[in-house]
């Protein structure tokens, strides 16, 4: 056992003994007396039983990794539900007992440790089905099991294992096997047959970050948890055993969770995503587009992905979090306790991380987000606005080429000239088109091809099947948002005598194009016309002449549950955001700064947030994910080493490495302590050169300090900061107004930090107003401009008041329905839903197996509300 693992074990032991005593030993995870059954006359013993693999009340699958710390532990008698299980526990070097206990019954179980003096220590464990739910409440139905080995309707099956390896030269192998008739990029791994293994000289050798050198052979475990697939990969030595008490030496105790992109729903099983930008870029492109997953494996990480945490397969953040909780428990029970966990993912993979980290803190210790958004439901407001403006302007491209003439005619007939459209959208017109084609259809409850349904139910049709299954994004959030109230029921809801899932979107009072009017880009008549005729969306996500009105309960619950990510619970996690320009592919660059603004609003700072910007579209640079993994690993290792009682948010800032700094360009990549990296080369040269004849020794190592200087210098390209240049005030002060204008121009030209219809309407970059508070129309908002038809502010304001009789958005006020985001909410059991969720009971235990003690992981609801 290497030094770091010994130190971790000692730190855990100290944490456990510090929580000993009769009080903690007789309390269950839910805070109730842990005695199961009639009152006992037992004498409470000294010591503690600790569940390492999860909170004791969240255990699933019938097993749990536990640790017993009592005096004279080797002579104690251990029972599970009255049956001796002492032979399943192993005495560790420090005298503690540790082991994987199995055979837990569904519901409450009791572990009891009897000492020789007749005293007893007890712990209640609440076990949930491996197929779920644990805390998400009633599961989506119907559900289609697509695995042939399923043994029940929860799709459960035994885990399956296969071995793969990385060839010594992937590039040479690719060149030798390239088929012009079927071109493609090589995958990261090749099949490994233990009965007929490849020659050892054909297998790459890797040295982990702890100095262990092994062949680059990977074991891939696949199985089913929570009715859907998971995948675990680990660097593996086929001839050796691996147990949670004795992991193979190449594991460094760290976990990397990777996620998939897009957004959607499904009524059947999916596939765990692979690749940093899975779902956003083609599979197999890792060698060119970057692959931090294979780099992590080579460094000794275990990697995890689940289909349920793939946003393109499952928009519901609660079941996504639940799948990670259950799967991370499985990792600990089969592989061993974890030091810390890093997330990575692009687009929907970034949303999933930031959603989950804010609503269920403790699952991750660090986030690497790429081509990111903050969440689904404020982004949905942007995309809904796009859809309405597209309808109004005629900016809609049919998939049928025959309709091209119709599109051209709509352009010519548009009430606003095409050159004026960006002033309304806040972005190039291509962005709304991509949004409408790629994402908006997922919101429609009557999707023609409802994903995964497989004819198990008929899909909703407002005319012919009002009782059909509604297949939209909102409908997948029923437990979180709740049903609509009877007073707003549509005819179909009245027919069914039940409300559909409420919509947390609203455009009441939104003045579309306000900034465009103020800047003189559109005329007063155009401004009045778009706001008079823009309309809204009904419950079926169809256009209606009236503005969209949010359902109050859904709106409040969207904040409460974390569906709207206010970023108020992210201070415990470092975040590295990787960003490139977006000319109109609906992955707006401004989202990185949107998250930063939310952090600044809730935390008072954004010191735990780093933005790396590069020229590669959306992603910034193809080497960013690998670089970010190395920097995040360094950041978390620093936090892990801090055993002080300092709050974790303070540790996050205190141990921020110098390499965790904002970047405008990726030119500093060659100046790296981990070895030089060439921008835009993916994994061609790092960690091992894949070009024939090139070795690491031939690539010169450059001073890392030069990288810091280069980042400061190139940072001026993106956001001229005179303070960074160290100029005296007498020079800097007169230049500052000019610099401010330059900065604003560079945000647009260099970083494509465009806006949205709501920022054009006056909302701040945080864009947290899914529904705004209203104020009376103010003539001051409409400066006189004879050229665009605003002759008097008062007269124009009167016309605006006729369109907005109840007032217009007041973005100086908090959003309507905004409440604090509660963490670790539960939504009932398989039969009964708790709409909007209720916080889990507070646990008295740290979940010691989830992360090193310095991270203080307890999986508890927020205690400061």
Residue ranges and their predicted role:
Residues 33-346, 350-865:
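C-terminal His-loop and adjacent cap/lid subdomain of alpha/beta-hydrolase
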Residues 20-23:
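Bacterial signal peptide processing site
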Residues 16-18:
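C-terminal motif of bacterial Sec signal peptides marking the signal peptidase cleavage site
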Residues 1-8:
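Bacterial N-terminal signal peptides that target proteins for export
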């Amino acid at each position: 056992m290497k030094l770091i693992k010994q130190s971790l074990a000692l730190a855990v032991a100290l944490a456990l003994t510090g929580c000993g005593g009769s009080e903690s030993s007789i309390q269950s995870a839910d805070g109730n007396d842990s005695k199961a059954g009639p009152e006992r006359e037992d004498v409470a013993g000294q010591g503690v039983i600790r569940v390492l693999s999860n909170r004791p009340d969240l255990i699933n699958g019938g097993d749990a990794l536990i640790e017993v710390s009592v005096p004279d532990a080797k002579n104690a008698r251990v029972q599970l539900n009255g049956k001796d299980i002492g032979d399943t526990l192993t005495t560790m070097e420090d005298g503690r007992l540790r082991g994987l206990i199995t055979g837990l019954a569904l519901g409450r179980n009791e572990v009891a440790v009897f000492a020789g003096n007749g005293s007893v220590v007890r712990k209640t464990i609440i076990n949930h089905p491996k197929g779920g739910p644990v805390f998400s409440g009633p599961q989506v139905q119907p559900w289609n099991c697509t695995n042939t080995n399923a043994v029940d309707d929860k799709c459960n099956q035994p885990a399956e294992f296969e071995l793969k390896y990385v060839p010594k030269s992937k590039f040479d192998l690719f060149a030798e096997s390239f088929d012009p008739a079927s071109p493609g990029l090589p995958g990261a791994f090749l099949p490994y047959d233990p009965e007929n293994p490849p020659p050892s000289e054909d297998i790459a050798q890797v040295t982990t970050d702890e100095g262990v050198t092994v062949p680059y052979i990977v074991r891939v475990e696949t199985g089913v948890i929570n009715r859907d697939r998971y995948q675990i990969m680990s660097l593996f030595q086929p001839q050796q055993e691996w147990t949670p008490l004795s992991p193979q030496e190449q594991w460094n105790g760290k976990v990397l969770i990777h996620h998939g992109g897009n957004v959607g729903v499904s009524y059947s099983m999916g596939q765990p995503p692979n690749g940093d930008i899975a779902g956003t870029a083609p599979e197999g492109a890792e060698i060119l587009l970057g692959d931090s997953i294979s780099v992590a494996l080579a460094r000794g990480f275990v990697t995890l992905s689940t289909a349920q945490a793939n946003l393109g397969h499952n928009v519901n953040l609660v079941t996504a979090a639940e799948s990670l909780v259950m799967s991370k428990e499985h990792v600990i029970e089969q592989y061993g306790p974890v030091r810390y966990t890093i997330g990575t993912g692009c687009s929907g993979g970034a949303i999933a991380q930031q959603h989950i980290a804010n609503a269920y803190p403790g699952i991750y210790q660090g986030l690497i987000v790429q081509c990111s958004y903050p969440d689904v439901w404020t982004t949905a407001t942007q995309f809904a606005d796009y859809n309405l403006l597209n309808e109004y302007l005629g900016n809609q491209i049919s998939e049928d080429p025959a309709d091209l003439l119709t599109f051209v005619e709509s352009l010519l007939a548009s009430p606003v000239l095409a050159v004026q459209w960006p002033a309304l959208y806040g972005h190039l017109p291509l962005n709304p088109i991509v949004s409408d084609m790629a994402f908006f259809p997922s919101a429609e409850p009557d999707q023609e091809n409802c994903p995964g349904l497989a004819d198990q139910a008929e899909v909703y049709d407002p005319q012919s099947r009002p009782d059909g299954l509604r297949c939209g994004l909102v409908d997948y959030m029923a437990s979180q948002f709740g049903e609509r109230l009877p007073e707003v029921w549509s005819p179909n809801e009245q027919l069914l005598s039940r409300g559909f899932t409420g919509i947390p979107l609203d455009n009441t009072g939104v003045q579309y194009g306000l900034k465009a009017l103020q800047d003189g880009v559109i005329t007063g008549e155009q401004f009045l016309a778009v706001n008079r005729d823009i309309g809204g969306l009904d419950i079926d996500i169809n256009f209606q002449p009236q503005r969209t009105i949010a359902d109050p309960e859904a709106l409040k619950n969207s904040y409460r549950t974390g569906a709207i990510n206010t970023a108020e619970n992210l201070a415990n996690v470092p975040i590295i955001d990787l960003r490139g320009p977006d000319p109109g592919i609906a992955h707006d660059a401004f989202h990185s700064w949107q998250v930063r603004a939310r952090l600044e609003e809730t935390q008072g700072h954004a010191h735990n947030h780093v933005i790396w910007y590069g020229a590669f579209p959306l992603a910034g640079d193809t080497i960013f994910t690998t670089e970010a993994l190395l920097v995040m690993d360094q950041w978390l290792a620093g936090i892990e080493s801090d055993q002080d009682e300092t709050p974790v948010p303070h540790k996050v800032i205190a141990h921020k490495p110098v390499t965790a700094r904002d970047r405008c360009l990726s030119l500093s990549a060659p100046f790296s302590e981990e070895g030089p990296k060439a921008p835009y080369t993916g994994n061609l040269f790092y960690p091992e050169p894949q070009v024939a004849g090139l070795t690491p020794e031939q690539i010169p190592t450059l001073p890392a300090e030069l990288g810091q200087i280069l980042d400061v210098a190139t940072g001026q390209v993106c956001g001229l900061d005179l303070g960074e240049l160290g100029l005296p005030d007498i020079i800097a002060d007169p230049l500052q107004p000019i610099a401010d204008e330059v900065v604003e121009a560079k945000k647009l030209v260099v970083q494509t930090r465009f806006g949205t219809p709501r920022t054009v309407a006056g909302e701040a970059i945080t864009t947290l107003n899914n529904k705004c508070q209203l104020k009376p129309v103010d003539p001051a908002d409409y400066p006189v401009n004879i050229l665009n038809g605003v002759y008097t502010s008062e007269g124009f304001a009167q016309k605006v008041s006729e369109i907005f009789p109840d007032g217009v958005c007041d973005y100086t006020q908090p959003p309507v329905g905004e409440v604090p985001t509660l963490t670790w909410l539960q939504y009932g059991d398989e039969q009964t839903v708790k709409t909007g969720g209720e916080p889990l009971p507070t646990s008295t235990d740290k979940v010691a197996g989830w992360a090193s003690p310095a991270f203080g992981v307890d999986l508890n609801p927020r205690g400061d509300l």
